[in-house]
C-alpha cells in the first residue's frame, strides 16, 4: 500500500519555510536559469540587453535633464550621476514587476505540482540580480572615463544596498503577487505606478532639489539606497546612515506586510489563479 503524504497550508512564516526553501534550492536555481534563458531567447545580443536599457535611459536623461534642463548632479558629471541611480532603480523596479507577475506567469506549475511558492518570486529577483551585475560593467567604464576611484570601504556597502533593494522588491512584490492572483488589474496598474515612483525617487535629480520637502522622499526606501550608492561610488557626500536606517525600517514593514499577505493567500493560489 502506497504512502499518502498530506501537505497542509500554513498561515504564518516560520523557520521551517526557510528550511524548505533550502531543501528546494536546486529547483530555485532551475527557475532562475529558465527565466534568464526565456528572457533573452532569440535575441541578437542576448544578455547585453541588460546593458542597453539603462544605458539608453542614461543617454536620454543626460540630454534632457543634463544638457537642456541643467539639472544639478552633486558636483559630478551627470551621466555617471544618473547611471548610478538607474542601476539600482532598474534592479528594484524590474524585480518588483517580475515578482508581482511570477505566480500568474507560472500558473500551469502552481496548479499541478507542490513546491514552496516563494521560489518563484525569489527566482524572479535572482534573474534581475544577474542583469544588475551585467549592467554594472557600464558603471565601471564610466568611472574610468571620468576618473573616479572609489574607496574600498565605500564599495563594501554595495552588498548591503543590494540586500535592501532585494528585500524592498520582495516585500512589495509578494503583496502585489498575492492580489494579482485574483485581480489581474495589478499587472496593468503597476507600470504606471513605477513610472510615477521613478520621479519621486532621486534617480534623475539630487534629493537636495526638493528643499524643505526632501523629507517626503525619505519615506521611499530606495531614496536611502540610491543616495548611499552615489556616496559610496562617487563620493558625492558622506553616507547618510540615518537615511539608510529609514530605508531599512521601511523595508522591514514591506517584508512583514508582503509575507503575511502571501502566506494568507497561499492556500488559495492553486484554486483561483
Residue positions per predicted region:
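Hydrophobic transmembrane alpha-helices and immediately adjacent juxtamembrane helices
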Residues: 1-273
